[in-house]
């Protein structure tokens, strides 16, 4: 989905370049489910992001947001952060949120009970930013860069790179 950031250029030197750009794309996962399934879906969505980055040999950690820091509507949220060897710190590369039934109430999204077809209840909604390519590119290059300037290609990407195992300047 296309995204636009208002505060471009409002931060320090560490956030120049592709880290904080005005317009970018990101790949989202959205789930609309029964209330009793939302906790399991939250775990699946979060795990998808963590597994994706780890498959690219990018170290990640997860920060659970405390209730006082949750944005409107969110019941639970966490940020996935990747390690930056250059900055020697983690930076945000994704987030996962469970909005409970709050968004469904605003949008009127209801589920009909199988047991009692006359009974309607509000769905739960969740979303997960799997990857924002500009930040993923930073994490990928920094964590796969070798001393000689070549970039290692992780095994899951090699079939899509014609079997290449590294990128090297000619």
Regions found by a protein language model. Give the residues of each.
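TRNA-recognition modules of translation machinery and tRNA-sensing kinases, especially anticodon-binding
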Residues: 1-170
């Amino acid at each position: 989905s296309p995204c636009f950031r208002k505060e471009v250029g409002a931060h320090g030197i560490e956030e120049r370049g592709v880290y904080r750009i005005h317009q970018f794309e990101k790949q989202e996962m959205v789930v609309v489910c029964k209330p009793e399934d939302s906790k399991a879906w939250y775990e699946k969505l979060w795990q998808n992001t963590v597994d994706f980055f780890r498959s690219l040999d990018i170290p990640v950690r997860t920060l659970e947001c405390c209730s006082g820091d949750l944005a409107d509507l969110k019941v639970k949220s966490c940020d996935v952060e990747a390690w930056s060897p250059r900055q020697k710190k983690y930076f945000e590369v994704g987030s996962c949120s469970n909005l409970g039934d709050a968004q469904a109430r605003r949008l009127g999204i209801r589920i009909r009970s199988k047991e009692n077809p006359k009974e309607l209840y509000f769905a739960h909604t969740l979303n997960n930013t799997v990857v924002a390519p500009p930040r993923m590119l930073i994490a990928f290059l920094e964590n796969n860069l070798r001393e000689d300037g070549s970039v290692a290609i992780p095994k899951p990407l090699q079939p899509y790179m014609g079997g290449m195992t590294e990128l090297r300047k000619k």
